[in-house]
Amino acid sequence: MSSAPAPGSAPVCLTLWDEEDFQGRRCRLLSDCANVCERGALRRVRSVKVENGAWVAFEYPDFQGQQFILEKGDYPCWSAWSGSSGHHSNQLLSFRPVLCANHSDSRVTLFEGENFQGCKFELSDDYPSLPSMGWTSKDVGSLKVSSGAWVAYQYPGYRGYQYVLERDRHSGEFRTYSDFGTQAHTGQLQSIRRVQH
């Protein structure tokens, strides 16, 4: 699925290099890429520059494995995109633009249980620690993204596994933690922020 830019905005654009520090062969993406190796341009990705938009990178082809949010800027090596992730990956093989990342109008509702059951809390701002704002469980059973795009993290302080949650994917409804991403083995979410577009 390709995303069309909002009226008046620049089209999404991402440049990849097969060596760290923006060296070696490069490949430019303007839409989804299920496997950068199949394009024939690169065997691996070691550095990334996001020129326009926000992107989700995956460690495996076909949008599988650990997710990494890539917002506008430079990522000269794997530690720049892995950061304090719970999983350090030195390979990125599939990419897609983030849909509907309208930072000024983002809203998500967290639910304690699966299928939108139990205690709930509606958010419209960034929270570096859900427990400190009153969320009593370390887990989120389900959530609804009413507008915008969010990145949720396994631990407080925007650390651990990343889960990119968009209004235009799953109709914004993530009924169980397994809907958060292919690497989600638990519903543990302890910080969340809006995607920077």
Curated annotation (Swiss-Prot):
SMART domains: XTALbg. It comes from the Eukaryota. Keywords: Eye lens protein, Repeat. One of its GO terms (molecular function) is structural constituent of eye lens. Homo/heterodimer, or complexes of higher-order. The structure of beta-crystallin oligomers seems to be stabilized through interactions between the N-terminal arms. Crystallins are the dominant structural components of the vertebrate eye lens. This is Beta-crystallin A2. It comes from Mus musculus. The lineage of its organism: Eukaryota, Metazoa, Chordata, Craniata, Vertebrata.
